[in-house]
Amino acid sequence: MGTFHRLTTTAGLQTALGTFSPATTVGFVPTMGALHGGHAALIRRARQECDVVVVSIFVNPLQFGPQEDLERYPRALEADTALCQQLGVDLLFVPSVAELYPTGMKHLTVVEPPRELTEHLCGRSRPGHFRGVATIVLKLLHLVQPDRAYFGQKDAQQLAIIRRCVADLNLDVEIIGCPIVRDADGLALSSRNQYLSAEERATALALSQSLEVAQAAFRQGCWDASLLLAQVQDHLRQFPQLRLDYAELVHPQTLVPLERIETVGLLAIAGWVGQTRLIDNCLLDRRRPILAVDGPAGAGKSTVTRLAAQALGLRYLDTGAMYRAVTWWCLENNLDLHDEPAIVEAIAHCRLHLESPDPHQPTRVWINDREVSQAIRSLEVTQRVSQIAALRGVRRLMVQQQRAIGAHGGIAAEGRDIGTHVFPEAGLKIFLTASPEERAQRRWQELQQQGHCDLSYEELLAQITARDTADQQRPYAPFRKAADAIEVCTDNLGIDEVVSKIVHLYRSRFPQP
């Protein structure tokens, strides 16, 4: 976004952050340095999703035990700096221990995560480790004040603990978990991999291989924890050079040990290869993958997604109807549409209920037990919905409800930030497009059929173009195509053709057993 700065003081960091507009979105990637492809993936995602990217490098002594590798932990500051510049990082924060812990560590205020999150997995053999992790991460989050912070799924226990601490302390940041990045041979990338000799590296592959064995059993319908763990242990017995620390199956959010996978489980493993301790994990998910359909107004998202959901046996979630409903509520109650606190406070008390019994008809919507299915599609609501949807507090409330609905999987959701913000982990992301002229023509014909002739085609085209601009420029969760979305242009295509294409893509990616 601007000049690259490598900063070593909190004063310098906060001064640099203060130069950005309040509307700027800040993405933060905390690291301990010795950056590799996994870190690069986090930075690239932050760069894609945020206006400003901040990376920190700090080898935190608070999270190392007395016999651990604090002194020999890899340090490569100049190479790390060059990589950050190459990836478009704006601010690289490289503080000293004295800068972050000026009073020393013996009398430091620390963050103690809930015991149930630390008594299993790595916490069992590394007492105090996650106290150190939580303390430094929350300290950095307070200093940087990011909108989004990015962490790798490889450190799954750390990710769960940070999410819990952020939620419990009401921190204003979204924690983003990103997939594990692996070398071509399957070994999960880690700064500690450079400790391994060629022979040790070959042995270390047993970790990811044992997870692959368990995943194969899971895909065949094995959901029992004891059987899955037996698959892992049986494979590892072939490698006596690898000393197993643990292999456990837990819930990925609560970290509670599971006896059987009912929805989703985290199969986590740690082991010693020589003097190097390595970790790895995989998610075993029984939930049906989410279909996320994004696109501009008038691209046909609602109709297409409803019909695709019916064909695939998924629940249809019309997020646009949710925003329309709360917009209607604001108008009905004569709220000042420029008074964001009043709007958010009012919407926080609203109860929304959606039903889509007929895929050929718009979603039926109730707000506070009052059906508003027709009212939310009025021209007045259409003209105001982007203004309300752009409010950060409103989007947060709606996204919370949308994620709660999608927590058990098996939904088809459409909107403008489904694949990028609401369900970034969606199994299939579709970006549905059409030219502004095509979308205006469709909307004009729809209004004609409904008996509304108040606007001309030219006026509708101007409205659609203005809404596109507003959605793309809103500061919170702006409208854009997800990097892994498949684009489908609906110009000159019939509804059935578009639905058929999406259904084929979903079934090809997720064949039913």
Curated annotation (Swiss-Prot):
Region feature (Cytidylate kinase): 283-513
List of catalytic residues: H39
Residues in the signal sequence: none
Binding site for (R)-pantoate: Q63, Q158
Gene3D superfamilies according to UniProt: HUPs (3.40.50.620), P-loop containing nucleotide triphosphate hydrolases (3.40.50.300), Pantoate-beta-alanine ligase, C-terminal domain (3.30.1300.10)
Residues reported to bind ATP: 32-39, 152-155, 181, 189-192
Single GO MF descriptor: CMP kinase activity
CDD domains reported for this sequence: CMPK (cd02020), PanC (cd00560)
A single Gene Ontology CC term: cytosol
InterPro entries: Cyt_trans-like, Cytidylate_kin, Cytidylate_kinase_dom, P-loop_NTPase, Pantoate_ligase, Pantoate_ligase/cytidylate_kin, Pantoate_ligase_C, Rossmann-like_a/b/a_fold
Region (Pantoate--beta-alanine ligase) location: 1-282
Family (UniProt): In the N-terminal section; belongs to the pantothenate synthetase family.
Cited function: Catalyzes the condensation of pantoate with beta-alanine in an ATP-dependent reaction via a pantoyl-adenylate intermediate. Catalyzes the transfer of a phosphate group from ATP to either CMP or dCMP to form CDP or dCDP and ADP, respectively.
Database matches in NCBIfam families: cmk, cyt_tran_rel, panC, PRK13477.1
Full protein name: Bifunctional pantoate ligase/cytidylate kinase
Species whose genome carries this gene: Thermosynechococcus vestitus (strain NIES-2133 / IAM M-273 / BP-1)
Gene behind this protein: panC/cmk
